[in-house]
UniProtKB/Swiss-Prot annotation:
The keyword tRNA-binding does not apply. Belongs to the cytochrome b family. This is Cytochrome b. GO terms for cellular component: mitochondrial inner membrane; respiratory chain complex III. The chain crosses the membrane at residues 33-53, 77-98, 113-133, 178-198, 226-246, 288-308, 320-340, 347-367. One of its GO terms (biological process) is mitochondrial electron transport, ubiquinol to cytochrome c. A ubiquinone binds at residue 201. Component of the ubiquinol-cytochrome c reductase complex (complex III or cytochrome b-c1 complex) that is part of the mitochondrial respiratory chain. The b-c1 complex mediates electron transfer from ubiquinol to cytochrome c. Contributes to the generation of a proton gradient across the mitochondrial membrane that is then used for ATP synthesis. Binds 2 heme b groups non-covalently. Heme b b562 binds at residues 83, 182. Heme b b566 binds at residues 97, 196. It comes from Cryptoprocta ferox (Fossa). It comes from the Eukaryota.
Length: 379
């Protein structure tokens, strides 16, 4: 009898994806984030399922139901905070994962990269709708401000916003549909993840050298399963430190005030992982221009493979491109900081400068540095 691991139709798929998968022997810890994202997704679905058992998506009771989860449900507080802070860990891993792809030229695997961009948009939509559900002040006003941006679309904008709201303002209908979408989207994300992996396993993984590694591969298990477990332990350590010692560190105090349409908070801002895009949006005085810049700040990733001018795949041996990538990281950190600051001098100016720097770095400076480095190779 043949090994069931290799002959059973279902187990064979798992075997070829996680056990006998030929993997480059030199991939570093930067390749851990894919598996960590899978764990984050599973954790979010699991904690979210238990939260959904006790949550009510009605404007009159939503805030109270979240309070009830934290106070009265067995271990409800830890489930709620694991879900809220799990989203932060999810986005930390997403940013690391995308940054790895940029640094090592993984974007040359175009199908995998493009599915990844669709995944990023879907994850961001899910997180945004999840932030609305507790129905605190920042939930309500965040939903109002962000959905209202669609009114900048010519001709259909206003109708589109009212269609999304299900009325003339963010109200009961909005909350109910956001809960429905927030529940279904993680399963759509899971399906997209399967497609992401399907495309990845068609070509095989990239590696730090950027060279073809067909001549030097090792089985995924036990080498990388052990390595992934180490990464997982560190992730759980960070998450539980956050959940058990300062669960509200990354949240907004305004969200502990029930939503009130008659009282606007002094500073409306989204969760920290959207602040870079929010800062770009705010730095453009024109509404439509701001919305376009907001979308393009993520969509620009789709153009990155087309702008690859270097003869080398990764940035491992390209110091000039490395400098530019770290400049981009610094710029994104600056934008994240600015997004959380009030709209006043000097923050407006800093935000505008950081936004101006963001797009040319990716669209102009990086391709030019690739050309210069090609010249240096023949110098």
């Amino acid at each position: 009898m043949a090994n069931i691991r290799k002959s059973h139709p279902l187990i064979k798929i798992v075997n070829e994806s996680f056990i006998d998968l030929p993997t480059p022997s030199n991939i570093s810890a930067w390749w851990n984030f894919g598996s960590l994202l899978g764990v984050c997704l599973a954790l979010q679905i699991l904690t979210g399922l238990f939260l959904a058992m006790h949550y009510t998506s009605d404007t009159a009771t939503a805030f109270s139901s979240v309070t009830h989860i934290c106070r009265d449900v067995n271990y409800g507080w830890i489930i709620r905070y694991m879900h809220a802070n799990g989203a932060s860990m999810f986005f930390i891993c997403v940013f690391m994962h995308v940054g790895r792809g940029m640094y090592y030229g993984s974007y040359t695997l175009s199908e995998t990269w493009n599915i990844g961009i669709i995944l990023l948009f879907t994850i961001m939509a899910t997180a945004f709708m999840g932030y609305v559900l507790p129905w605190g002040q920042m939930s309500f006003w965040g939903a109002t401000v962000i959905t209202n941006l669609l009114s900048a679309i010519p001709y259909v904008g206003t109708n589109l916003v009212e269609w999304i709201w299900g009325g003339f303002s963010v109200d009961k209908a909005t909350l109910t549909r956001f809960f429905a979408f927030h529940f279904i989207l993680p399963f759509i994300i899971s399906a997209l993840v399967a497609v992401h992996l399907l495309f990845l396993h068609e070509t095989g993984s990239n590696n730090p050298s950027g060279l073809v590694s067909n001549s030097d591969k090792i089985p995924f298990h036990p080498y990388y399963t052990i390595k992934d477990i180490l990464g997982l332990l560190l992730l759980i350590l960070m998450l539980m430190l956050l959940v058990l010692f300062s669960p509200d560190l990354l949240g907004d105090p305004d969200n502990y005030t029930p939503a009130n349409p008659l009282n606007t908070p002094p500073h409306i801002k989204p969760e920290w992982y959207f602040l870079f895009a929010y800062a770009i949006l705010r730095s453009i005085p024109n509404k439509l221009g701001g919305v376009m810049a907001l979308v393009l700040s993520i969509l620009v990733l789709a153009i990155v493979p087309l702008l690859h001018t270097s003869k080398q795949r990764g940035m491992t041996f390209r110091p000039l491109s490395q400098c530019l990538l770290w400049l981009l990281v610094a710029d994104l950190l600056t934008l994240t900081w600015i997004g959380g600051q009030p709209v006043e001098y000097p923050f407006i100016t800093i935000g505008q400068l950081a936004s101006i720097l963001y797009f040319p770095t990716i669209l102009i400076l990086m391709p030019i540095s690739g050309i210069i480095e090609n010249q240096l190779l023949t110098w």
